[in-house]
Amino acid sequence: MSNPSKLSISPPNTFQHVGGSNLHVNKPPALQSPPRSPPLQHTTAQNNLAKSTSASNIAGIANQTTPSSSGSSSGSSSLNSIGSLTKSTSNSNLNINHYSSGNATMGASLQSTNTGNTITQSSSPPSSSSSTNNNNNVLPLPNKILHHPSPKKTTKSTIISGKLKRFFKSRPSRDSLYEKHILSAPFSSATLSFINIFKIITALKKTNAIETEGLFRVNGNAESVRSLWLMLNNVQEAIPVDGNSSAHDLAGLLKLYLRESKFPLVPLELFTSPAVPATIDEARVFVEEKLPTENVRVLSYLIEYLEQVSLKSSINKMNPIGLGVCFAPNILRSVNTNPSNPQFQVHMTNIQSHCNFITLLIENRLKIFKDSALSPVQGSNDDEILENLIIQSPDDELFDEQHQHEQELIDSSHEHHHSINNGDNNNNVDTSNVNGGSGDENNQSNVINDTALYDEFISLLTDESLGSSQKSVIIQRMTTLFQTDGDRFKSFLRDMQIDGIISLLEYILTLDEN
């Protein structure tokens, strides 16, 4: 077979081979599909054909290069593919072997016949019975490339979308961000005042909030708390007790007022060492010698009410330990809340000792605070306001009787507490005496079990004898509870709410394992 590159163009309507005579063969050899690479080189014949404007020249070349059915044509080389060698001419409307990969259609094709030098156009695709030679002469164009999104990009978008959805479902509440000072609360900082503390606690007593389950642990309605906050601006008027505000709203107001006051009730800067008072004597010395007089008065009145709440723990599920967890972040604060402040960092690492300090004050109030919080303070300007606020309304007589009865219960309970050894758990007090023996035995057993679980964790958290194994022991105990008694452990976590859980996790995660 001759090389196509040796073809040349003679005068019009003639086509001859160079370097030999035409040889007649009975059967031309089968044409082979040219390799796809390297790309085809344009020959002189192809260039002339591309520049030709006469359809007859194209027909002449086609007749010379296509073998006839009778075998009379020479076994010369043929053009590999007319569709791939020619361009559209200016005088011809032929579309040579144009395929579409998308819809499998084909335009008119150029075919040679054995009847003469004519060109026929066919609008239909070649039949399946076409010769192998014709099929081999056709070079299909490459398929159309469809652009699909990158699998890696799609996977990454899905992951990010899933993370955002999980974040918005489990994002912390706005109030919790206020408590952590991540967001600035929409309340103007208040000056710590005994009058406002007295007004809030008086409203709590009138609503009988002491018998509300989860008091100070369950968050109140944010809008109601904001409305109550505005009422504190009018010092002369008491907080109205109506159906618009629940006990949880008033409890939230009390914590908010302590948290947003300009000066903390118990500043961390007053501690001479990072260690917080852990005994009754240390706490009494700290209160008498370190705290300002107004702060002592506010703290005494607040602890007195929290003591009353703890005595109703069989109803409200709030024992001294739970109250310590809820109030420690609001009472013990640093004057400078900048995270880079050393006192702030000490507060974050000693948060459990702060909770224990508040629990100590509640359980030993009469030994730590001497004077009554309602006794006149020398040089105080609040006495006249207090007299106006304490003026009894027709419904206050029942409240005073209840308050007197609660005080008697407190005194009797303290006598019972002091008869127990200091090493015993003070939270397992027989609450049947406080409630006059009322309540079924099942409820009492549940309360004892919950209290025992609280006491067990506090014992683990404060047991220094465990040393470096303290963290692993606590985690192992939590894992065992979750596997063996999951319902009880989940109920324990629900009772702690967000503040207690955060305090527990912060303490565990900051334990040193070295």
Swiss-Prot record:
Q: What gene name is listed for this protein? A: gacD
Please give a single GO biological process term from the UniProt record: signal transduction
Which residues does the annotation list for site: Arginine finger? R217
Sorted UniProt keywords? Cytoplasm, GTPase activation
Cite the SUPFAM superfamilies for this sequence. Answer: GTPase activation domain, GAP
Which lineage?
Eukaryota, Amoebozoa, Evosea, Eumycetozoa, Dictyostelia
Q: Which InterPro entries does the entry link to?
A: Rho_GTPase_activation_prot, RhoGAP_dom
Q: Where is the composition biased (Basic and acidic residues)?
A: 401-414
Polar residues composition-biased segments: 1-16, 105-121
The conditions that induce or repress this protein are given as:
Down-regulated by Pseudomonas aeruginosa, PAO1 strain and PA14 strain infection.
Q: Which residue ranges have biased composition labelled Basic residues?
A: 145-155
Keyword Lipid biosynthesis in annotation: no
Q: Which GO terms describe its cellular component?
A: cytoplasm
Q: What name does this protein carry?
A: Rho GTPase-activating protein gacD
Localization (cell)? Cytoplasm
Per UniProt, the ranges with Low complexity bias are 68-91, 122-143, 421-435
Residue ranges of domain Rho-GAP in the record: 185-369
Q: Name one GO molecular function term.
A: GTPase activator activity
Q: Which residues form a coiled coil?
A: none
Q: Where is this region: Disordered?
A: 1-46, 61-91, 105-156, 401-446
The record's function comment reads:
Rho GTPase-activating protein involved in the signal transduction pathway.
